[in-house]
Curated annotation (Swiss-Prot):
Assigned EC number: 2.7.1.39
Family statement: Belongs to the GHMP kinase family. Homoserine kinase subfamily.
Gene designation per UniProt: thrB
Listed transmembrane segments: none
Electron transport listed as a keyword: no
Name of this protein: Homoserine kinase
Keyword Amino-acid biosynthesis: yes
Source organism: Picosynechococcus sp. (strain ATCC 27264 / PCC 7002 / PR-6)
Main location: cytoplasm
Residues at which ATP binds: 93-103
Length: 305
């Protein structure tokens, strides 16, 4: 095998109270075509499919996250890293809180593993992905699909899939400005009050029942948080009016997707289009260009096409 085509979904992490441990895969995808190159060709070259402002930021260097993940597999196997050409079709925007880095990590690992003859198990790939990302909430659902809770137990990970009812519809509103994960983490406190821990524990306990049962009362109460969102919302211009617009249009609630600035609302199918329009309009009303999507939960995760 000299080429492989990999598709990886976007992800939304945290979903309110599940900070750094909960995430879900979304029906928005990046695709990566890996082709082994000859020794006379560059060690790494990029082809950008449908090149736009986002893809112009990517460079074919050894520091490229996609290439680092690709090389990680061969280093793990104790093999030389082959020269490779990678064509990227980018649909997940960069630095927006939709797991773009997770798509690169998982895509690079899965592509390299396939080209090496698939010696690594899915679990081994998952562990490498978590090691590279530093936390599991994006890479685990990006690899496995669905909604996944990741719990570190001793030296291993316990992965618990959550049922997500098909009538709980994710709506994402993506502004045209970026917010780095590093900046979003820098505003978080080092310590929290006991009441804040109890608040989040109760919401995280309620959330899976709301998602599985399509229970509006549970979802409305569960989509709240005191660990990260109160601190990060001030980094996102328009957070309050967008939230108010989403709720007024019928959303159960709204949360920051990952580190932001994308905002995620959950709604009933009949309300989801109205919620999307309301969120986008609210942002545009304060001078922020934005685009909103009514999506689904991607249950497949990463696939080889």
């Amino acid at each position: 095998m000299t080429s492989i085509h990999v598709q990886v979904p976007a992800t939304t992490a945290n979903i309110g109270a599940g900070f750094d441990c909960l995430g879900a895969a979304l029906s928005l995808h990046n695709q990566f075509q890996f082709r082994l190159a000859g020794e006379s060709e560059p060690f790494f070259s990029l082809e950008l499919v449908g090149a736009d402002v986002e893809t112009q930021k990517l460079e074919a260097t050894a520091d490229n996250l996609l290439y680092r993940a690709f090389a990680k597999v061969f280093a793990t196997l104790g093999q030389p890293v082959p020269h490779v050409n990678i064509a990227i079709d980018l649909k997940v925007p960069l630095s927006r809180g939709l797991g773009s880095s997770a798509t690169a990590i998982v895509g690079g690992l899965v592509g390299a593993n396939a080209l090496a003859g698939s010696p690594l198990s899915q679990r081994e790939i998952m562990n490498l992905a978590i090691e590279m990302e530093g936390h599991p909430d994006n890479v685990v659902p990006a690899l496995l699909g669905g909604c996944q809770l990741s719990v570190k137990h001793q030296q291993d990970w316990v992965i618990c899939p959550w049922v997500w009812h098909e009538n709980v519809v994710p709506v994402v509103a993506i502004p045209d400005f970026e917010l780095s994960t590093e900046e979003a983490r820098a505003v978080l406190p080092q310590q929290y009050a006991r009441a804040q821990a109890i608040f989040n524990a109760s919401r995280l306990g309620l959330l899976p029942h709301g998602l599985a049962q399509n229970n509006p009362e549970y979802l409305t109460a569960a989509l709240d948080d005191q660990i990260h969102q109160p601190y990060r919302k001030n980094l996102i211009k328009g957070y309050d009016p967008v939230q108010q617009a989403a709720i007024a249009a019928g959303a159960y609630g709204m949360v920051i997707s990952g580190a932001g600035p994308t905002l995620l609302a959950l709604a009933a199918p009949e309300n989801a289009p109205k919620v999307a329009t309301a969120m986008q309009t609210a942002w545009e009303g304060i001078g922020v260009k934005a685009i909103a999507h009514v999506l689904e939960i991607d249950q497949q995760g990463t696939v080889i096409l």
